[in-house]
From Swiss-Prot:
This is Translation initiation factor IF-2. Gene3D superfamilies: P-loop containing nucleotide triphosphate hydrolases, Putative DNA-binding domain, N-terminal subdomain of bacterial translation initiation factor IF2, Translation factors, Translation initiation factor IF- 2, domain 3. Residues 295-304 have a biased composition (Polar residues). Residues 446-453 are annotated as: G1.
Length: 937
């Protein structure tokens, strides 16, 4: 479309019509409205105006020229085989020259003119011009003021010089008058003459003093005036220089040290380095009268190629300086590398820098070296001096790393990692949420076989104890029971000594402890331990004296034994109620529950309900069909299905929630035990459980805990290995019994591993290669093959593929469901690994009465058995004058001509000794044998 008016032309230029009208008026084209016609001359006039505004010559004169230079050279280079080959090298250089306008030297070169210019740009330029004009006006006014002050100072100086001259003339005339005055001695006028003379002398002194003062003042004024005049003159000269200087000129900084010339702009190849002699005589850019530097004045220096001169002469295969511009060939045909022959001016610091190094809980050698700004090899050297062999990826614990940092002369600080768990502390308080009464959590504790589970059985009216393997509890069970007085949550703990940690967890999570003591058995070791756990947790005790229906029950003895353990009954002034019960007949059960609820009322147990749930992992296991399953006791808040929970390093969304009877529920309040599914892994029993706001935060904290646990464990293992390295070298070789333990729940695994590791001695050690929750899989069998371990399954079984693999590789898999049996069998196996004890038993004493030398046989001794018996093949000691001369064994034993096995006391015999002939008459032989006796743990 032809643009023949202002509006159409503005549309074509994609700019507002009123802005285009303003630009047309500035260009001298008078157009008043957008409908006015535009001719080609008007458009050309506008274009010329815009070009001038942008610093482009209107006649289209070229102000920039680009020169391109291409140069091809050849170099000869030896390849990997030693043959010489020619390489073509092409160097392309490009240089651009810009012609600047001489009339406006202060303006910097501008870019090509834009097709249009907006109002904001015009206003900005006008404002800049106005500021420049104001600055020049101020500078001129300052200059005029300084010049006037200079003229005034010069006038004052002339006046002072004139006054000084007049004073000198007056003094000279006075002296001349005194010299020319005649001396007349008249007797009658002597008195008058004397008066005149005194007056003249006084006037002369006054005149001299006045002249001196005037001269001094004049000289001081002259010095001050001269200094002021010089200061004003210097200031005027500076202002003039500033006004005459080009406004936008940038002074090039003087180089602090000689450096190589900058490569030409646009070149595709690095220019050659200059020789040391040429650096001093380097040409400077020519400077014109208006102080404008011309870059083209030193163009020839840019194009110099000194590499040719440097490389001239006979080329040899050993010439390492071959090639252009410092490029050198790599050895044996490898890629060439560039070597800069210029010397660096950098000087290394003379003083050692002491750094503050913040050391986290775990750190690798490489990271520690980076923090200290040293090479990793230096850190490894210092570690070797400290007796530790390691690599750069080795993880060091905090203590070792801090010792190393101090050893290397730096300051070590124990630093905390960026702990995302700090975010958990923000949402812990529920001060604004009302706390409501909750049911008490009661833990039943006591010695094994004292009837804890049977007591709970009767309370729950269920048969649990009969289902336990061996009739003993090996898991911690959680149940809640509705009574007429309210709900009570019970935790049943094992009584066996192996389950110490499990009982401690039960005491930690509980409000009240029921201590079950058998009336016929009294206080036993685990009873004492349960009392200690309850006291450590600060939990009130209710003592249930069980089995009162048995004939051998003695309640008074039980009370006395408990008083000895600082558990005093209420009837004796203590604070622990004693209740006699019978789990078999149900006698005293109601009284026991009454006492429990009474204690709960005194404690005033409360917890927030409408809040995110928090609780404790009571037990955890890996179910083949359901995955990780955790039994949780909710302590506060309400746990709902679908909540995101975090338990130690395990996290996940609650997919299903079951009560202790296996029924599905949707939510659980305080003091309710539930079984949840959906966690990423089996959590450790005793871990705290909390509901998180979102899954991302739970995942972040869980992964952080996993990494932290792994790093700390690895660092501790490494430290333990290094500590025990030299100790083990000094002792004999310790025998290991490697084991892989798989259990049904986390608590059983913990108890079994602890019990087996307690069996370790200085000679035989139980090495638990791997311990986990769940069934025995193929990976467990493969691990057993690699580590030559025995697999123990506690209440678990191996699947079909694992059984086949174990049979094929001869891996021993043992199944147990009672912890006693597992511990006893492992103890027996370890006893078999012990080195047998050697005992020496004396058999008899033989006297040598005759020695017969036979050339082919050696010395034959004719002997008489004094006591005991002499057996063929037994060990003997040769005694000469009751001193042991030799220890060995009998080679042959004969009676007459027949070989015999033994000769008893009172009989004669002939014998030879193995590899020994130095026997004499009268020597005695002590016959003995060494017996090996099996040892037990």
């Amino acid at each position: 479309m032809a643009s023949n008016n202002v509006a159409q032309f503005a549309t074509e230029l994609k700019m507002p019509a009123d802005v285009l009208l303003t630009q047309l008026r500035d260009a001298g084209v008078e157009k008043s409205s957008t409908s006015d016609e535009l001719s080609k001359a008007d458009k050309d006039k506008l274009l010329d105006h815009l070009r001038r505004a942008h610093g482009v010559a209107p006649d289209g004169e070229k102000k920039k020229i680009t020169l391109t230079r291409k140069e091809t050279t050849e170099i000869k280079q030896a390849d990997a085989t030693g043959k010489s080959r020619t390489i073509q090298v092409e160097v392309r250089k490009k240089r651009t020259f810009v012609k600047r306008d001489e009339s406006t030297p202060e303006e910097a070169p501008v870019k090509a003119a834009a097709p249009v210019i907006d109002e904001a740009e015009i206003e900005r330029r006008a404002e800049e011009a106005r500021r420049q004009a104001e600055l020049i006006a101020r500078q001129e006014a300052d200059l005029r003021e300084k010049q006037e002050r200079l003229a005034k100072l010069e006038a004052e100086k002339e006046a002072q010089a004139k006054a000084l001259k007049q004073a000198e003339q007056a003094e000279a005339e006075a002296q001349k008058a005194d010299a020319a005055k005649p001396v007349e001695a008249k007797a009658d006028e002597s008195a008058q003459e004397e008066k005149k003379r005194v007056a003249a002398e006084e006037s002369k002194k006054k005149a001299a003093q006045l002249a001196k003062d005037a001269a001094k003042e004049a000289s001081e004024k002259a010095v001050a005036t001269e200094a002021a005049r010089k200061a004003v003159a210097d200031e005027v000269a500076q202002i003039k220089a500033m006004m005459n200087a080009p406004r936008r000129a940038i002074k090039a900084p003087e180089p602090a040290a000689p450096v190589a010339a900058k490569p030409a702009e646009g070149t595709l190849h690095k220019p050659a380095d200059k020789k040391a002699g040429e650096k001093k005589d380097e040409k400077k850019p020519a400077v014109t009268a208006d102080k404008k530097s011309i870059k083209s004045a030193n163009v020839s220096s840019t194009w110099q190629d000194d590499a040719k001169k440097r490389g001239a002469g006979i080329k040899t295969r050993g010439n390492t300086g071959g090639g252009r511009d410092g490029w050198r060939a790599g050895p044996k045909g490898r890629r060439p590398s560039h070597h800069d022959d210029r010397e660096s001016n950098f000087q290394a610091p003379t003083e050692a820098v002491v750094k503050d190094v913040h050391v986290p809980e775990t750190i690798t050698v490489a990271e520690l070296a980076h923090k200290m700004s040293v090479k990793a090899s230096e850190v490894i050297k210092h570690l070797m001096k400290l007796g530790q062999m390691c690599t750069i990826n080795q993880v060091l614990d905090q203590e070792t790393a801090m010792i190393l940092v101090e050893e290397m002369g730096h300051t070590a600080h124990a630093a905390k990692l960026d702990d995302p768990e700090a975010l958990l502390e923000q949402g812990e308080e529920h001060a604004d949420i009302e706390a409501l009464p909750r049911a008490p959590v009661v833990t039943v504790m006591g010695h094994v076989d004292h009837g804890k589970t049977s007591l709970l059985d009767y309370i729950r009216r269920a048969k649990v104890a009969s289902g336990e393997a061996g009739g003993i509890t090996q898991h911690i069970g959680a149940y809640h029971v509705e009574t007429p007085r309210g709900m009570i949550t019970f935790l049943d703990t094992p009584g066996h000594e192996a389950f110490t940690a499990m009982r401690a967890r039960g005491a930690k999570a509980t409000d009240i402890v029921i201590l079950v003591v058998a009336a016929d058995d009294g206080v036993m070791p685990q009873t004492k331990e349960a009392i200690a756990h309850a006291k450590a947790a600060g939990v009130p005790l209710v003592v249930a004296i069980n089995k009162i229906d048995k004939p051998g029950a003695n309640m008074d003895r039980v009370k006395q034994e408990l008083i000895a353990e600082q558990v005093v009954p209420e009837e004796y002034g203590g604070d622990s109620p004693f209740v006699p019960v019978s789990a078999k007949t149900g006698e005293g059960i109601d009284a026991l529950l009454e006492q429990v609820l009474l204690q709960a009322e005194v404690l005033e147990l409360k917890a927030p309900v409408d809040a995110p749930a928090r609780g404790l992992v009571v037990e955890a296991k890996l179910d083949k069909g359901r995955g990780p399953v955790a039994t949780i006791l909710v302590q506060s808040g309400t746990l709902k299905r679908g909540d995101v929970v975090l338990a130690g390093s395990a996290y996940g969304r609650v997919r299903a929630m079951l009560d202790e009877n296996g029924k599905s529920i949707t939510e659980a309040g305080p003091s309710i035990p539930v079984e949840i599914q959906g966690l990423t892994e089996v959590p450790n029993a005793g871990e705290e459980v909390m509901v998180m706001a979102d899954e991302r935060k739970a995942r972040e904290i869980g992964l952080f805990r996993q990494g932290k646990f792994r790093d700390v464990k690895l660092a501790k293992q490494q430290a333990a290995k290094l500590e025990n390295m030299f100790e083990n070298m000094g002792e004999g070789e310790v025998k290991n019994l490697p084991m892989i333990i798989k259990t049904d729940v986390q608590g059983s695994q913990e108890a079994l591993v602890g019990s087996l590791q307690k069996l370790s001695t200085s000679e035989v050690r139980v090495q638990v290669v791997h311990a986990a929750v769940g069934g025995i899989s193929e990976s467990d069998v493969n691990l057993a093959v690699a580590s030559k371990a025995v697999i123990i399954g506690f209440n678990t079984r191996a699947d079909a593929s694992a059984r086949k693999l174990a049979e094929a590789n001869g891996v021993d898999i043992r199944y147990y469901n009672i912890i006693y049996d597992a511990v006893d069998e492992i103890k027996a196996a370890m006893s078999g690994m012990l080195a047998p004890e050697k005992r020496e038993q004396a058999l008899g004493l033989v006297e040598i009465r005759q020695v017969i030398l036979v050339s082919k046989v050696g010395a034959i001794a004719g002997c008489y058995v004094l006591e005991g018996v002499a057996k063929r093949g037994s060990s003997v000691r040769l005694l000469r004058d009751n001193v042991v001369v030799w220890t060995g064994e009998l080679d042959s034993l004969k009676r007459f001509k027949d070989d015999v096995k033994e000769v008893k006391a009172g009989f004669e015999c002939g014998l030879t000794l193995k590899n020994f002939n130095d026997i004499k008459e009268g020597d005695q032989l002590e016959v003995f044998e060494v017996q090996e006796i099996a040892r037990t743990l």
